[in-house]
Amino acid sequence: IMTTFLQQILHISAFTDKFYLKIRSFNMKDNKTEVKHFFTMFDKYKNLLRELTRKNVKLKYRDSWLGIFWSFLQPLMTMIVLTVVFGNIFGANRKHIVCYPVYLFTGRLLFEFFTSSTKKALTSFRSNAPIIKKVYVPKYMYPLSGILSNFVTFSISILCYICVWIFFKATGLLGGAGLTINFYALLFVVPMAILLIFVIGVGLILSVLQVYFRDIEYIWDVFCTLLFYCVPIIYPLQQITTPWIKAIIKINPLYSMLELFRQCVLYCQPMSWKLLLYALAWALATLGLGVFIFLSLIHI
């Protein structure tokens, strides 16, 4: 155990030293060249990225009887279980929640995409080690293909969400009669795109960290479990009465992206420009940081 611990310390030290030296030797001209090369390689290998993404989707359901149908069934079963468990506690609050199962579904859908994609990116180098050793492919293709394969699954799950929405609207169960739809519902692609950019940034950072610090996989699992309860997925934000806790939740970029998504598909109202700019700033900053760290520490 002590030997393993010392190895992890050495890996962290190597990571911090290399990153520190990269920052000290930062040159705008050289970094522009690296970034240009990054996107040039992306364009060159875009067909390979498509194939890697397709492979990841197929492998995910390869040994399953129901196959890709799990993209419908899994979020649906999760919604039913969480509605039974938390419905009586939070679902009765009709003032802040129109239809609790649909409210829960939207939150769970986005959060599941975030966690599954980042975990896939985190382990992408390890799971593709045989290919990396034999064939040259730009390294960022591996975390990126993992994220995009989960985005495909996420997009399919949107169809399940539509079916759930129609069911509760038609039956009027659990406040479903209060659901509405208009033009603003079509704008859901905007927060989806922002979330995808944010996830790519986080995924690039995690994939690099995992190379130097293997325990990050377990730390990230614990972090995602805690994060689930720190984002208003199963409860409305208005139910939090402590001001400083509410302020911390609002700082979380996932909250702003989730709220934007709900404003479109659940409340069918214009998106808040303040939330939109805040979420976009977080997404672009995280992507920029992810690309910088990746180029600094991984030879593409």
Residue locations for each model-derived region?
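Hydrophobic transmembrane alpha-helices and immediately adjacent juxtamembrane helices
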Residues: 14-298
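Generic extreme N-terminus detector
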Residues: 5-6, 32
